[in-house]
Curated annotation (Swiss-Prot):
PANTHER family: NADH-UBIQUINONE OXIDOREDUCTASE CHAIN 2. Its EC number is 7.1.1.2. The keyword Electron transport applies. It is a multi-pass membrane protein. It comes from the Eukaryota. Signal peptide: none annotated. It catalyses: a ubiquinone + NADH + 5 H(+)(in) = a ubiquinol + NAD(+) + 4 H(+)(out). GO terms for cellular component: mitochondrial inner membrane. GO terms for biological process: mitochondrial electron transport, NADH to ubiquinone. Belongs to the complex I subunit 2 family. This is NADH-ubiquinone oxidoreductase chain 2. The lineage of its organism: Eukaryota, Metazoa, Chordata, Craniata, Vertebrata. Pfam families: NADH_dehy_S2_C, Proton_antipo_M.
Length: 346
C-alpha cells in the first residue's frame, strides 16, 4: 500500500465517525457509517494475504447488509411518522430493524459470526480499530434511540453475548480471536444497561476502549499473534509482559483494577431497576471470560518457554514501550479509586 494512503484512510475514519455521532438526520448518519466501512477495508486487506482479503470481503458484505437495514429502518419510520430525526424513532417495526442492524454492525449475538474471523485476518492495529473506533458510531445510534428500543430484546441479546463470548473464548489459542470474543462479551455488558442508563453504557465503552487499546498495543509491540508467542516474549520484554498481565486482569474485571468499575456500577444499576436475576446471570457468565483472561495472563508472565537456555532473561531487550501504551496501561490499572468522581461526572 502507498505509505501516503494510511493517513488519508485514518482521516476518513475520523470524518465518518464525526459525521455519524454529530448528525440528527438518518441519511447523514448512514453516510458516516458508509465512509467508515469504505475507509477500513483497505487497512484490513493491506497485507494482500488471502486471509486478509477474505476478512475484508466478509467485513464488506456484513456491513453493507447492516447499512441497508439501517436505511430501510429509517425509511420505514419516515413513511409511518414523517420524521427523519434519529431521536424520533417511534415505529415498532423500525425499532426492531434498527436493533438488528446495529447488532450486526457491533457483532452482538446472534449476529456475531463475522467478527472473530475478520479480526483474525486483520493486522493487530487494524484489529484495534475494529474493536474500538468502529464500534463507536453504531453504539452512538443505539444511545440516541435508547428510549425507543425494546429492553427485553436487548437484555436477551446481552446475556447471549456474555455467555457466547466467554464460552467460545475458552478454547482459543490465537490472541486476536481471544480479544474478539472478549469484545463480544463486553458488548453484552454495554447492551444490558443501555436502555436504563445510556451514560453508564458510554462510560463502560470508554473504559473498554482504554483497556483493549493497551492490550493490542502491548501485543503489537511483542508481535504476539498466539499464546506460544506470548509465552516466549517474557525473556525479551519482562516489564511489558508484567504490565500486560495487569491490564488483562483489569479487562477481566478483577478488583482493585479499573475494569471492576463498570461491572460494579452496571450490577448496581440493574439491581435498582429490579433486574436482579439478569444482574446475577451476567455476573456469573463473566466468570467464563475470566478463565481465558487468566490463561493469557498466566502465559504472559508466570510460565517460561521450554528451551535449553539456563538463564531467565536475555542479555538484550527490546526498545521500551511507547508513551501511549504506558499511558493507556496506567489508566487501565489505576482508575478504580477515582470511580466516585467519574460516576458523579457521568
Amino acid at each position: 500500500m502507498n505509505p501516503h494512503a494510511t493517513p488519508v484512510l485514518v482521516l476518513s475514519l475520523a470524518l465518518g465517525t464525526t459525521i455519524t455521532i454529530s448528525s440528527n438526520h438518518w441519511v447523514l448518519a448512514w453516510t458516516g457509517l458508509e465512509i467508515n466501512t469504505l475507509a477500513i477495508i483497505p487497512l484490513i486487506s493491506k497485507s494482500h494475504h488471502p486471509r486478509a482479503v477474505e476478512a475484508a470481503t466478509k467485513y464488506f458484505l456484513t456491513q453493507a447488509a447492516a447499512s441497508a437495514l439501517v436505511l430501510f429502518s429509517s425509511m420505514t419510520n419516515a413513511w409511518a411518522t414523517g420524521q427523519w430525526d434519529i431521536t424520533q424513532l417511534n415505529h415498532p417495526t423500525s425499532c426492531l430493524l434498527l436493533t438488528a442492524a446495529i447488532a450486526i454492525k457491533l457483532g452482538l449475538v446472534p449476529f456475531h459470526f463475522w467478527f472473530p474471523e475478520v479480526l483474525q485476518g486483520s493486522p493487530l492495529m487494524t484489529a484495534l480499530l475494529l474493536s474500538t473506533l468502529m464500534k463507536f458510531p453504531p453504539l452512538t445510534l443505539l444511545l440516541m434511540t435508547s428510549k425507543s428500543l425494546n429492553p427485553a430484546l436487548l437484555t436477551t441479546m446481552a446475556l447471549a453475548s456474555a455467555a457466547l463470548g466467554g464460552w467460545m473464548g475458552l478454547n482459543q489459542t490465537q490472541t486476536r480471536k481471544i480479544l474478539a470474543f472478549s469484545s463480544i462479551s463486553h458488548l453484552g455488558w454495554i447492551a444490558i444497561i443501555l436502555v436504563y442508563s445510556p451514560k453508564l453504557a458510554l462510560l463502560t465503552f470508554y473504559l473498554y476502549t482504554i483497556m483493549t487499546s493497551a492490550v493490542f498495543m502491548a501485543l503489537n509491540k511483542i508481535k504476539a499473534l498466539n499464546l506460544s508467542m506470548v509465552l516466549t516474549s517474557w525473556t525479551k520484554t519482562p516489564v511489558l509482559n508484567a504490565t500486560l498481565m495487569l491490564v488483562l486482569l483489569s479487562l477481566a474485571g478483577l478488583p482493585p483494577l479499573t475494569g471492576f468499575m463498570p461491572k460494579w456500577l452496571i450490577i448496581q444499576e440493574l439491581t435498582k431497576q429490579e433486574m436482579t436475576p439478569a444482574a446475577m446471570a451476567i455476573a456469573m457468565l463473566s466468570l467464563l471470560s475470566l478463565f481465558f483472561y487468566l490463561r493469557l495472563a498466566y502465559h504472559s508472565t508466570i510460565t517460561l518457554p521450554p528451551n535449553s537456555s539456563n538463564h531467565m532473561k536475555q542479555w538484550y531487550t527490546s526498545k521500551p514501550p511507547s508513551t501511549p501504551t504506558a499511558i493507556l496501561a496506567s489508566l487501565s490499572i489505576l482508575l478504580l479509586p477515582l470511580s466516585p468522581m467519574i460516576h458523579a461526572i457521568v
